[in-house]
């Protein structure tokens, strides 16, 4: 469910990066589309307009944990190989390691679990609206 990936982008920017760096910076220019408009439109489209040909099973929701896991491992590997660096030339461009490696790993774990949670929520909402529209 790729829509969970863009949903994750929306929630990370809105709830984590926005309060730290400022929403006005993260929603400027093209980022307005990437961080706000496209994620919201895709989630709304999935919930209200997408009618799956086959039922999306609960097992499918776990697949959404793969992408942030791979991305997070590549992110950490980049920092391990190249070093964290100093702002503004840092390899930790999200600032996840500002509070140390332990907190950074907890943030990484939370993001992977949040991706799964978003997928479960979207699946449940889609199931409800699909039933509603198919009953008419």
What are these regions (language model features)?
Residues 14-24, 80:
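Juxtamembrane "helix-exit" motif on the non-cytosolic side of transmembrane helices
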Residues 1-5, 57-65:
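Interfacial segments of alpha-helical transmembrane regions
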Residues 1-17:
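Small-polar-interrupted transmembrane alpha-helices in polytopic inner-membrane proteins
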């Amino acid at each position: 469910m790729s829509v969970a990936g863009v949903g994750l982008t929306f929630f990370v920017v809105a709830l984590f990066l926005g309060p730290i760096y400022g929403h006005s910076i993260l929603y400027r220019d093209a980022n307005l589309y990437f961080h706000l408009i496209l994620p919201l439109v895709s989630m709304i489209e999935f919930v209200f307009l997408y009618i799956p040909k086959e039922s999306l099973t609960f097992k499918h929701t776990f697949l959404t944990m793969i992408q942030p896991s791979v991305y997070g491992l590549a992110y950490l590997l980049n920092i391990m190989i190249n070093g964290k660096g100093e702002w503004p030339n840092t390899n930790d461009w999200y600032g996840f390691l500002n509070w140390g490696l332990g907190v950074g790993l907890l943030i990484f774990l939370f993001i992977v679990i949040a991706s799964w949670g978003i997928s479960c929520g979207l699946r449940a909402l889609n199931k409800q609206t699909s039933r509603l529209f198919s009953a008419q």
